[in-house]
Structures are given as structure tokens and as C-alpha cells.
Amino acid sequence: MSSNITQAFICDAIRTPFGRYGGALSSIRTDDLGAIPLRALMARNPQVDWAAVTDVFYGNANQAGEDNRNVAHMSSLLAGLPIDVPGATLNRLCGSGLDAVGSAARAIKSGEAGLMIAGGVESMSRAPFVMPKAETAFSRNTAVYDTTIGWRFVNKLMKEKYGVDSMPETAENVATDYKIEREAQDRMALASQMKAVAAQKAGHLAREITAVTIPQKKGDAIVVDQDEHPRETSMESLAKLKGVVRPDGTVTAGNASGVNDGSCALLLANETLAGKYGLTPKARVVGMATAGVAPRVMGIGPAPATLKVLAQTGLSLDQIDVIELNEAFAAQGLAVLRMLGLKDDDERVNAWGGAIALGHPLGASGARLATTAVNRLHATGGRYALCTMCIGVGQGIAVILERV
């Protein structure tokens, strides 16, 4: 590590619980949901002059509903950050939250920023239906799209050239192309659930969660303080599920990530401002890389992104102690592991559960990976962590962190 380069440090990180689709967090507006971890960061670090924040980068994939007017800045204002602190919403679909963390670190490393907030928010429960304007007057053929996930307003040329497979279809494509067995997918799903339930019981996940209080019209407020998606299951139960793309398919609701709600925020600083405001650096952001892949097999994106960030940082997979691989689907997660020469059950991967168990609120997930990775590094004494994700329309993203 060169002493001449400004370093970017993660000094704090916190998230909401991840709620099920239509679950406890579904009554909270997206911009209000995004404000919750920001408010928690401010409360946990009262000594910070929040007017010194250079920018707020928040990931968000939808932007068709209550997140439509730059939700990063709306959430910042709702959280009580000074009005002169700007904010920008990043949209790299599923990788948005991780991109926000990496981009904030880049701003600090460049010397243009000293104190940054990064994170992401997504309320998939509250994703609206949208419709285009009619092509002709008095048309009765207007389509209506559900913006929860996947394609809408499809470009015919895109469809002709690359196809517009749904997310489960891309996972089925990966399973076919890379010969990922149904049983292996179910094993990964079961392991994710078991690890998440164990992490909840051990209190590991509680370290990164701020409780959300939801007032009720009648009776006491509801307090949500843990993820709603983890559940007990078995190989027998998973094996009974039908394929979501076709009845004999391998991708099921049980071995795919959830449709969820949640938000997450991280505080990043250079060494000077961390010292000035009494912040304790927890991890250094070593590097970030992105990669493009064919949209029909978007799930393999983490493999080339990981190889790029390893080459960029001069590290090898053998030096990585903690791996947070976003489990969009077990099929793509297993394909990535095998492409990287790792075992299906590598103990470094998702030790506290992955997205199959914890959920995948698109724009928030990457920030959650970074948050969990930092906590796992400190819990295990490891040095380096890799966070990596696949991205719809054919991309991958990877970030490497170093424990401080």
C-alpha cells in the first residue's frame, strides 16, 4: 500500500432488516426506507460534522415509483442531513449498492472527497405498475408493466440481437450451459438458509441491523429487528418445488433469491477526516472492477469481474479470507464458483447466509454485502474480503476490502 495514495476507509455500516415481499416493511415509502440507515449512522456518530459530507451515493434499481426523483438526495433530506449535502442515485441494477460503495471510495482516493456516504435502497413490494403513452390517439392497446423486477419497454433491436430472457430464464440458461445440477442448487439453497438461521441465532446479523419501528393504526407499533426471509427447510422440501421457467426446470422459488425490501448505508472517510471526527476505520476499499457478459447468462458476471479486480489489486483468490457472493440464483452462484476454481461448499463463501436466505432488495444488496464482509472480517480476523454480484442485462461487479 503506497503512502502517497489517499486511502478510502469504511468507518461504519448499518442496514435495515430485509423484509419479505408484502411483509413488515412494505408499508414504508421507498424514500423513507432509504432514510432509516442514514438516520442511524448520524445517531451513532454524533461527533461528525455532517455538513462535511462531500456526497451521498445510493444504489437503486427501480426508480419508477417513490424512488423516482433521485432517491439518494430525497432520503438524505428526510434523514436530516444538511440541505447543502448533495446526493446521486446510481443504477447498475442489482450491482447498484456495491457500485455506490466502490464509487464513493474512488471519489475519496481521487482526492475530490474526504467524507462520503454510500449505500442503497429498494422496496420491491412498492414497485409500481407503469404504462407507456399511446402511440396513436384513442388507442386501447396500451401495455401495463409490473416494475418489481425484469424487463419493461423492451427495445425490439435488443430482443433480436441479445434476447430479453427473464431473470429465472437466464439462471436456467446458466444451469444448462454450465451443467449445474438441480441437487447442487438445492444444496446451496439449504446451506444458505441454515447459515442465515444460525447467524441470526448467534447474533451475527444483529450487529449490522438497525431496528425499524412501524406505527399501526390500532395498537402498539411493530418493531422489526431481524430479516424476514430466512426459514427452516430441507432437501426434501426443496426437491418438491417445480421449476419456475418450465415444470422440469432446475430453477425454483426455493433455490433463487427473494423479492425483498430494505436499505443500507456506509460511512467512508479518508484518514485525515476519520481522525478529525473520531471515526474508527474498519476496512480499506482496495479496489473495484466491473465486467460485461452475454445478457442471456448474466449470472456468470461475477467471475470475470472477480478476475479483473484481483488483477487490478495484485491479489489472488488464495489470499481472500471472506467471500460474499450474491446468490441471485443458486445456479449462477455455483457456476461462478466453479469458473473460479472454487468448491461448491467453500467455507469462505456466505458464512452468515446469502441472498437466497436473506433476500435481495436489488439496489440495497451490494451495500449489504460490503457491510457483512466488514463484520465477518472482524469476527474472524481475516485480512481480505471479496464482494461480488451478477447484474441484469449482462454484467458483474466485484469489490475487495481489507480489514483495518
What are the residue ranges of the model-derived segments?
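Conserved active-site "lid/cap" helical segment
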Residues: 2-75, 79, 170-182, 192, ...
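N-terminal extracellular/periplasmic Venus flytrap/periplasmic-binding protein-like
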Residues: 15-16, 27-36, 47, 184-276, ...
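Conserved catalytic cysteine-centered active-site region
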Residues: 28, 60-115, 148-151, 161-167, ...
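Active-site pocket-lining segment
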Residues: 172, 208, 216, 286-357
